[in-house]
């Protein structure tokens, strides 16, 4: 029974890089916002520098704008971390002849995203590797109606050998062919 069902966990937004950027943007945003407020009230709110000498218009105003923008992005990133957006699992069930792709979305009607496909509708397991400025290395579920469903999460590119090994194992498990996209 255990050999007939395979479940791969997907890490969502709770990755080190998201924690790093949320913290970095929060601290930077607070610094910029406090610098702008300091220039307006002529009171030094930052202990490590004197920002009271900044002219409020335009420097202080721009600093406040960038600070507020940075704080907004950091709060959004923190919310995606708290809600664990994008996490879930892929389940491959040879007993029921199904592939289930389950992910967490944003709160609301579609908080839990469930995609179910019959193995009879699956044509192959596909690998897509693109190099360059924004490299991607992904495994796809290729359906007979020409749709490609991504199975790997958005992340830093993994080693090509690891990706190929994972795709090969999955193709062998599902008794499907492997193709390059």
Curated annotation (Swiss-Prot):
Transmembrane region(s): 19-39, 62-82
Localisation per UniProt entry: Plastid, Chloroplast thylakoid membrane
InterPro entries: PSI_Ycf4_assembly
Sections of the chain in a coiled coil: none
Family: Belongs to the Ycf4 family.
NCBIfam families: PRK02542.1 (NF002712)
Record protein name field: Photosystem I assembly protein Ycf4
Lineage: Eukaryota, Sar, Stramenopiles, Ochrophyta, Bacillariophyta
């Amino acid at each position: 029974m255990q050999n007939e069902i395979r479940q791969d966990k997907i890490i969502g937004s709770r990755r080190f890089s998201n924690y790093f950027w949320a913290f970095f943007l929060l601290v930077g945003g607070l610094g910029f916002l406090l610098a702008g407020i300091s220039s307006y009230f002529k009171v030094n709110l930052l202990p490590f520098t004197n920002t009271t000498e900044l002219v409020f218009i335009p420097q202080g105003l721009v600093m406040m704008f960038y600070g507020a923008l940075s704080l907004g992005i950091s709060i959004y990133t923190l919310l995606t971390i708290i809600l664990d957006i994008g996490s879930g699992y892929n389940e491959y069930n040879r007993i029921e002849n199904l592939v289930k792709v389950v992910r967490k979305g944003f709160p609301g009607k579609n908080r839990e995203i469930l995609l179910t496909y019959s193995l009879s509708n699956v044509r192959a397991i596909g690998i897509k590797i693109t190099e360059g400025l924004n490299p991607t290395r992904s495994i796809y579920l290729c359906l007979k109606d020409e749709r490609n469903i991504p199975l790997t999460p958005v992340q830093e590119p993994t080693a090509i050998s690891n990706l190929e090994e994972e795709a090969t194992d999955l193709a062998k498990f599902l008794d499907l062919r492997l193709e390059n996209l």
